Amino acid sequence: MSITIRPYRDSDLPRIQQLTVEAFEPVCIDRNIEDRFGVIAGRDWAWRKARHLTGDAEREPAGIHVAENDGSIVGYITTWSDHEAGIGNIPNLAVDRDHRGQGLGRQLIAFALDVFKAAGLSHARIETLDQNSAGQNLYPSMGFREVARQIHYCLDLADRPSPQE
């Protein structure tokens, strides 16, 4: 496998959205919400999760890098840098199912960490859900330390009385 990591191009968005939906299906907050409440506002969890990539591309397109194997995108990482706080953030990382378990996620994270370090940042953040065992194994193996656990809640507003006018 000959992997090249290159900067994101606008034309990459559909493919990285596809990778996102495939990779995050079993470990996505939006999927958990849909499993509990059903489809919301006519938009399924996959639409919501793919939309996160649109937001990443709008916020900091230079922070997205894709991994190619023989010209095909097989993974990506999104990052954004808070230079004032000295922290680099990794909101999304996905690898094509046929390329998992071969070190590509590790390679993409290492690439991002090198970018953060070269930019003068002092720390990097990444987060994962409790149900994402791959992330929980990978991130500590790369030196990340768990600092907190978070619980996510959702409320169906149809169950709430209308405000008085």
Task: Provide a role label for each language-model segment.
Residues 2-4:
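Extreme N-terminal starter segment of soluble prokaryotic enzymes
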Residues 7-11, 18-91, 96, 109-111, ...:
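Acetyl-CoA-dependent GNAT
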Residues 15, 107, 134:
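Charged catalytic carboxylate motif
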Residues 95, 101-114, 137-141:
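Conserved acetyl-CoA-binding loop-helix of GNAT-fold acetyltransferases
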Residues 100, 126-136, 154-158:
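Conserved beta-strand-loop-alpha-helix junction that forms the acyl-donor binding cleft
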Residues 116-127:
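Conserved GNAT acetyl-CoA-binding A-motif
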Residues 160-165:
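Short, charged/polar, Gly/Pro-enriched secondary-structure boundary elements
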